[in-house]
């Protein structure tokens, strides 16, 4: 989570949940900064079981979104999911590689605003 205040509120509300404050667009640096998500400099990736993102990715330039997706897929175990919630009509990030599979949920109409979940996987 980017907001320190929101992290504090989440930590108080969910004391058993690890909450990490940082910038998702500097994902590896943020994950190395604390919480034990990535260990040390020798951990070069392929160690995470999944990533769930709900930030408004369509507000960022396509190049920034692609950089984040590529970094996330490098940090994930082969075939592990990167999930992106989106309210937009278009795919939030178009992968650079055919090695990345993309699947989407149906529209979730009970959510306001309606949303879809996009699932990206590499090496699956």
Sequence positions of predicted segments:
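Short "lid" loop at the C-terminus of a central beta-strand within the Rossmann-like core
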Residues: 56-59, 87-92, 108-110
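Conserved beta-strand signature within the Rossmann-like core of class I S-adenosyl-L-methionine
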Residues: 76-88
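Core SAM-dependent methyltransferase catalytic element
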Residues: 107-124
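A short SAM/SAH-binding and catalytic strip from SAM-dependent methyltransferases
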Residues: 46-64
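Short, charged/polar "capping" segments at the starts of alpha-helices
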Residues: 5-8, 90-94
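Conserved acidic E/D residue at the C-terminus of a beta-strand in Rossmann-like folds
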Residues: 1-2
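S-adenosyl-L-methionine
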Residues: 5-41
């Amino acid at each position: 989570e980017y907001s320190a205040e929101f992290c504090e509120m989440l930590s108080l509300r969910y004391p058993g949940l690890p909450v990490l404050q940082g910038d998702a667009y500097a994902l590896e640096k943020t994950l190395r900064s604390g919480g034990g998500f990535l260990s040390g400099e020798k951990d070069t990736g392929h160690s995470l079981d999944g990533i769930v993102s709900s930030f408004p990715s369509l507000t960022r330039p396509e190049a920034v979104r692609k950089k984040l997706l590529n970094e996330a897929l490098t940090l994930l175990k082969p075939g592990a999911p990167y999930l992106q919630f989106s309210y937009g009509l278009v795919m939030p990030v178009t992968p650079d590689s055919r090695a990345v599979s993309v699947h989407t949920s149906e529209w979730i109409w009970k959510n306001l605003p309606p949303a879809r979940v996009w699932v990206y996987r590499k090496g699956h």
